[in-house]
Amino acid sequence: MEAAAVTVTRSATRRRRRQLQGLAAPEAGTQEEQEDQEPRPRRRRPGRSIKDEEEETVFREVVSFSPDPLPVRYYDKDTTKPISFYLSSLEELLAWKPRLEDGFNVALEPLACRQPPLSSQRPRTLLCHDMMGGYLDDRFIQGSVVQTPYAFYHWQCIDVFVYFSHHTVTIPPVGWTNTAHRHGVCVLGTFITEWNEGGRLCEAFLAGDERSYQAVADRLVQITQFFRFDGWLINIENSLSLAAVGNMPPFLRYLTTQLHRQVPGGLVLWYDSVVQSGQLKWQDELNQHNRVFFDSCDGFFTNYNWREEHLERMLGQAGERRADVYVGVDVFARGNVVGGRFDTDKSLELIRKHGFSVALFAPGWVYECLEKKDFFQNQDKFWGRLERYLPTHSICSLPFVTSFCLGMGARRVCYGQEEAVGPWYHLSAQEIQPLFGEHRLGGDGRGWVRTHCCLEDAWHGGSSLLVRGVIPPEVGNVAVRLFSLQAPVPPKIYLSMVYKLEGPTDVTVALELTTGDAGSCHIGGISVLNAETSSRHSLRPLRVPPTKLARWVGRCGRQLSGGWVQHCYEVSLRGCLLLDLLVCFSRPPGSREEESFTCRLGEIQVVDAASLLAPLPQVQAVTISHIRWQPSASEREGPPALLQLSCTLHWSFLLSQVRCFRIHCWGGMSDDSPGRELPRPEMPMFLGLAFATQYRIVDLLVEAAGPGQDRRMEFLVEPVPKEGFRVPQAEWGRAVLLYSAPA
């Protein structure tokens, strides 16, 4: 249901707000009516900045309980929440065309620049995510309420992420694409055919002329390009006729060529299944029977039942493309495999010995098969055992901002202020994760630092990074490297760190960085040049932050709510490459004892000073559509006093400048569902995060309009800049919904 829109000035809007707060409201008008624009004395809402001539769009709606059906492919049938989806047949694939609803599933995050690039010949690590059929809690694009969701956060060890399911065309849920891209990891969907039905599907597009298979390839490329992921794993798990298998290499070559043209860095991989005779016959290696498929695309993913002799034989077959062979490792250890489960390191030891890439299949084993309450401990144990075989990659662009949020939590916090209580899970909200693990000093090993993700407290989002350690008596400090970067830096950068120490301790905390190109690199704003290397620097906190940067540094040097402290730094550089971010923990002056510490990191930011002064565009053209009304669940009989409102917001904004959008409203009410809390009177109610220029509001509790009355809802869209500061409310986008009872 579309609401009729009219435009009014703020003065008319304020007059109507006063009417709705107790005065008699005028009769509801028709859709063509416009609100009068007679100026009135202005009364400011606390905390709001009002521009005199600013206009807002008002949508009029007469409440109706008639259904407004939404397409089930794009919306959960029970809640109408937007969901990620798959395609189940060749017909669905060929018929796919972009629709407005597809916009929910388009990735906001482009693939981040990284070093080394994926095209380098360093052996890579591929993670193939296969969990209980796929499209579980991760299908809810705007998040969901989940007590113990699965989380992956060792991204700096991963080069390629494949989302796997047994549906014909598996389009990765957008949350995975956003999160992986943020970490410089490319994302592949899966094109799979299986059993007799799969055989018929393959014959339909492969046994004919080139137009048939080119149409399928073109559609796969269009889907990749539209949803902004990076390519496909091709998995043919059925026998092929001679005609069909003969057309498979040209299909792969055409798909790979077209993808490379349309998607920078695009990737097509072939799974070890069918051989060149058309038989379904897994080889567990690259050999003369399947080499033709490897030669036709970007890489080869082997089956899992290999032995070291398979790896040795593959050396000759792979030649200079050794890194393009991804040796499959089933973490569930099904079949006659090497390693698996907590012995997966045995598989990787052999694979890396021979210089191949690795494909870890279903590492969600730690979540599916072990106790959920021990998930984080088991996840860290699993990846910790693989650490020596997993080379990391570096992020190489600014701004660099992270609150360590995992995209989940037991409550939601916004810059130290609690917004909502209750479990939540939103994959797109996961921010850049650090290098995890335990770091020990040399010698007797008494000095150590460990990092863990922790849901118990947060500065922004739902989690923080817990750093525990011991400073032994013989050293003055210990440091932990959190991020590997290779970022060219502008002449001046600002850095910020939010942290808090727990328990009685006098240990001091400092942010450090390392720089490259030391011969020509000049750096200002440092307090200590580490004696071990001229490229590691300890930063000097700003005592008086520049007033022109108040919106970013307003909290610098202050003790904040919840015990958090924020330090800000200004660093001048010339000809430098930013390599690492470290946090250093130093013993108090005069101390000669062993010092233990527990520190919680809430946020780290590295931003170009010039970007903080650049104006941010405003959110434009907010619209309201697909409105659905329901009586409150507790008032199914008689005239309802409360209603449940669902609707979709759309707006315009330059996506390259934002991390996400925060959606709020005036006029909504708290309900009993977890994660939603009645706001303070001077604050709008937070509804959720959007990682697209559209957002579906679902079952918002509102007051019913009485006879002859209008009720008012105001929806606000807050852009969150990549630099990580809050935008004043006057710069948010907004739209008003005026609704009335039927005549």
From Swiss-Prot:
Catalytic activity annotation: an N(4)-(oligosaccharide-(1->3)-[oligosaccharide-(1->6)]-beta-D-Man-(1->4)-beta-D-GlcNAc-(1->4)-alpha-D-GlcNAc)-L-asparaginyl-[protein] + H2O = an oligosaccharide-(1->3)-[oligosaccharide-(1->6)]-beta-D-Man-(1->4)-D-GlcNAc + N(4)-(N-acetyl-beta-D-glucosaminyl)-L-asparaginyl-[protein]
Sequence ranges of Low complexity compositional bias: 1-11
Pfam families listed in its UniProt record: Glyco_hydro_85 (PF03644)
One Gene Ontology molecular-function label: mannosyl-glycoprotein endo-beta-N-acetylglucosaminidase activity
Family indicated by similarity: Belongs to the glycosyl hydrolase 85 family.
Task of the protein: Endoglycosidase that releases N-glycans from glycoproteins by cleaving the beta-1,4-glycosidic bond in the N,N'-diacetylchitobiose core. Involved in the processing of free oligosaccharides in the cytosol.
Identification of the protein by name: Cytosolic endo-beta-N-acetylglucosaminidase
Organism for this UniProt entry: Homo sapiens (Human)
Organism phylogeny: Eukaryota, Metazoa, Chordata, Craniata, Vertebrata
Name of the encoding gene: ENGASE
